[in-house]
Regions:
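Short beta-strand scaffold segments in enzyme catalytic cores
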Residues: 40, 88-92, 227-231
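Active-site metal-binding loops of divalent metal-dependent hydrolases
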Residues: 9, 162, 255
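Short, conserved phosphate/pyrophosphate- and ester-handling motifs at nucleotide-, phospho-/glycolipid
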Residues: 42, 192, 253
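Ribokinase/PfkB-type carbohydrate-kinase core domain
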Residues: 1-4, 69, 96-237, 268, ...
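Hydrophobic beta-strand scaffold residues
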Residues: 49, 75, 158-160
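Conserved phosphate-binding/catalytic region of the ribokinase-like
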Residues: 149, 205-312
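Glycine-rich phosphate/adenosyl-contacting loop at the front of the ribokinase-like
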Residues: 1-73
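Beta-strand->loop->alpha-helix junctions that form or flank phosphate-binding loops
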Residues: 54-56, 76-84, 220
Length: 312
């Protein structure tokens, strides 16, 4: 069984050195994109993975498709669109490795995922689907609905990373309403502390669990340098970030989501997870994500389980 990720793949041009975009003199080209990152993490950790996305018929798209192939992510659901461009992100880093983004995204191939692209998917081989909030607009919105509705009916586990990017949506009210529209599909959600209020209207995760996330199986609540909280039924697990010097946090949240999902799928019975097992999954995901911040780039920083065990 496999993991299918639907949504964006783009190129991160990461500023070399510390400083704002206008101060950076050169950039390093890295493959990235929230859901593409999760596909690569799942593959690294032993799960067959597919990416359902659309890339431009351009050199950037060639680079990204070749990256997926090098990472052994199956590309049979990757389409190429000649009349749109591959999205780009320019990333600047501060002294802590935290990021600021400038995107070339509107009108890009990510928003051209079609219903025909979705119709090609064989759900009988898919155990879990992962998506995020960036691509649920324009043509791709309807395609997400089509896939997730079919997946829900087929009993496929659905994972969602809120991953807010306000500068990619013109109307933030529509952004909020659109995300809420997709929440009924979701079994596993990752939401950051700085995203919770926009999504739920409260800064209190306990309130959000009762009001907005009550139908979900697992809630991953990330708190940056303060670690994470993981909720499953009556269990609550708290993790702390290991003492690691961060160089670049690009893709760390995706590493957390992807590594937790991978461990969750390894569990024999998703309806019966002990607090001890949940704690082990959460600790693995926290440590895995932290280790990826010691290198620049997202996909290029991801580890196999053997590489992880050699470092931890």
């Amino acid at each position: 069984m496999a993991v299918l990720c639907i949504g964006e793949m783009l190129i991160d041009f990461i500023g070399e050195g510390v400083g704002t975009i206008d101060k950076v003199k050169s950039f390093k080209k890295e493959a990235g994109g929230c859901v593409a990152n999760v596909a690569c993490v799942a593959q690294k950790l032993g799960h067959k993975s597919y990416l359902l996305t659309s890339l431009g018929q351009d050199g950037f798209g060639d680079f990204l498709e070749n990256t997926l192939k090098n990472e052994n992510v199956d590309c049979k659901y990757v389409s190429r669109k000649a009349d749109s461009f591959t999205p780009l992100a320019f990333v600047s880093l501060d002294e802590t490795g935290d990021r600021s983004f400038s995107f070339y995204f509107k009108g890009s191939s990510t928003l051209r995922i079609s219903k025909e692209d979705v119709e090609k998917v064989d759900l009988s081989e898919i155990e879990a689907i992962h998506f995020a909030s960036i691509a649920i607009q324009e043509e791709s919105k309807d395609s997400h609905h089509l896939l997730l509705k079919k997946a829900k009916e087929a009993g496929v586990l659905i994972s969602f990373d809120v991953n807010l990017r306000f500068n990619l949506w013109d109307d933030h009210k529509v952004y909020h309403e659109t995300i809420k529209e997709f929440l009924p599909y979701v079994d596993v959600i990752k939401v950051a502390d700085n995203e919770l209020e926009f999504l739920t209207g409260t800064t209190n995760i306990e309130e959000a669990l009762k009001k907005d996330f009550s139908h979900m199986e697992v809630v991953l609540y990330t708190k940056g340098e303060h670690g994470a909280e993981v909720y499953y039924e009556n269990h609550k697990v708290v993790t702390e970030i290991p003492n690691i010097k961060a160089v670049d946090t690009t893709g760390a949240g995706d590493a957390f989501a992807g590594s937790f999902l991978s461990k969750l799928l390894n569990h024999e019975d998703l309806n019966n997870i002990s607090e001890e097992d949940l704690a082990q999954m959460a600790k693995f995901a926290t440590n895995y994500a932290s280790l990826t911040t010691t290198k620049t780039g997202a996909i290029s920083s991801y580890l196999t389980e053997e590489e992880y065990n050699n470092l931890i």
